[in-house]
Every structure is written in structure tokens, then in C-alpha cells.
Amino acid sequence: MVSQDEVRVFHTVDDVRESIDQLSDDSFFTYGWFKTLESFGMLPDPLYLTASYEGSTIAIAPCFIDKINDFFSWGPNIIPFLHRLLNVSQRLGLYKNNVLLCYSPACCRTKILFDKNYNDTSVLSLLSKKIDNICKEQKVLFSSFLFVSEFDELLMKNLEHLNYMKFPNIVTFYLDLSWSNFDDYLNSLKPGMRKKIRREIKKCSDNGVTIKEEHITENIADKLSELEAIVSSKYDPTSNNKLPSSFFLTLQKYAKDKIRLFVARKNDEVIGFSLLLQHKELLDVYMYGSDYTAQTNTFFTYFNLAYYKPIQLAIDEKIKKIYFRYLNEKVRLDRGCRPEQTYSFIKCHNVLLQPSMNTLLKNSLYSKLRSRFLPDYFKK
């Protein structure tokens, strides 16, 4: 039986390097990913909660104090002016204006990594108590499991019993792979879509575009940074968060063979790329970059980089699942993907406020008013 004394907190992924990759089945919950984020200050206050039994790590809950305000970009809007209220609370010295988050940045997934022999409610309860203690010691008013999958039975069934409130969050998409070759995959789709995909692959080639897998090197890292910024600015013109070339080199350094990079070239010039992360039997299409001036819509570079090449790779290497993130619902469903609903679980850590907060959030009238007048942060 695991005791509370065997639940520890580490502040760098270096301290859980071996166990995290062993327990994880997800590329965004690995040493290489978290080490890259820590190196760039993109995970400013990490907390790796571990549960041990007889000297072995049996569970890890990656969390962090949200100093980058991810909650107020991706979470549910539970009460009016929450961010302002937390800012006032911090100025008065009552509570910090940050939320403790359990999730891995950039992947829209929350996971607790368990040894398969200890995936039970007692370990989850101990980790939850440790979160309670951290929030009390550091004066953090709210914690959140930000993106819990509808398929995560342990978290879905038990977090509410641990005084977390549940709210729907974004819908992501995934593809389960059971085909022996790409033609079998195409044959699983509707006839019109099969024809369309074959045409898009042929058109890409006919336009002189070649797509090959490459390693991240100094020669190409600058181009990855440039093309990623072009795509980011297209969808968010106010964004100034350009990833430097050193980010890609650092990711290659720490993630190593977990990096899968497809590069599209025309006349030997890089015009696009897709960056994937792989761990064990899971592949995640993480990033896409493009030079829109060097191609037209008839090149179909995006679909080849973001869908067809990753699917072909996964089939060839017997990978079981690909994550494709959120948005573009019709595009993803037409290509065989399935939706995966995520939920945010939120807890107030003030013993006086928690009962009234839970009562308010469960009130049907308030829920209707909230859904009408308080758009969730991720919908803005």
C-alpha cells in the first residue's frame, strides 16, 4: 500500500528522467518534451508529483503553476472576472493569481502516468492530496486537470469525488490504425474521399513538390522557425510568440528519435514541413509550417504533410494511434478520424469558498446564464 510519505514533488524532469519515459505512452509526456520546455522557460514552475512503492515509481502527475496563463486561454470561464479577482487577491496577499494545472503544454491532453499494476483510485487520491497541500502552502486558490479525455476512465469517474467540478472543453481528433498498407486505409473511406486523396497526392507530386523525412539540423532549423511563424500569424495576427531556431535544435537534442520531421521542397527550396512527435505506439502531428507565397492551393502540400505522410509512416511502422489536435472537424472526419471530447476539472482550495462555489456551479440557472454570457476562454 502506498502512503502519503511516498508521494514526492520534483521541480525538474531530470529527477524523473528514467521513470517518466517508462511509464508514459504519449510523446508529450516524455523527458525530451518537458526538458525542452524547461530549457526555454515555457514551463516556468514545473511540479512532477510521483508516487512510489518499494522503491519504484508507480505514478507521475506532471503539473505546473500556470504563470503563462494557459488556463485563461484554454479553460472554462466559470465565474465573471476570475482573472481580475485573482489579481486583486494577489495584491492583497491572499492568493496567487495563478492556477495549478495538470496537463502538458501544446498537446491538449491531461494524463497521470501509471504503472499498469497500480492504476487505481488510492494512488490518485494520494496525488490529489499532494496537490491540495501544494495549493495550501503556495496560496493557490484553484487547480485544474485541464484536458481530461472522455476515455480516461480513472480520472473521469473519480475527480468529481475529489471535489473537482467538471466542464466540457475542446474536442480533439485521433485516428486508430489497423490497416496493413495505405491502400487498405483508403479503401476504408468513402469512394469520393478515396478519389480525392489519390488526386491530392498526385497533384502534389505533379507540381514538383517532394516530401521526405529529415532530421532537424542547424541548416533547416531557421526555416522551421520562419515557416511556423507564417502559419501562426495567419491564424493569430497579434501573436508575437515566434519559436526561435534554437527551440527546434533543443527539441532534437532531447527528444532525439521521438522527432519525426517531414519536409516539402520545390526546386530544392523548403516550402513546408510537418513536425511529429512519437513515443511507443502513439504519433502526434504537433506542428505545421508553410511558405504560402511559394505554392498554390492546387499543390495540396498541407494535406500531404499533415495527413497522408504521417498516416503512411504510422502504417509502415505499426503505430496504433495518431493525434490530430482540434478544429478542422470535417477535414479530419472525412479522412477517418474520430472525435475525442475533453473535459476540464476545477477545484477551489479555500475550505470556506469551496462548498458555496460548488453549489453555485452546479446550479442549473447559473449554468444557463454562464453558457449564455460567459464564453469559455477556449472559444474566444
Regions found by a protein language model. Name each.
Residues 1-380:
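N-acyltransferase acceptor-side catalytic subdomain
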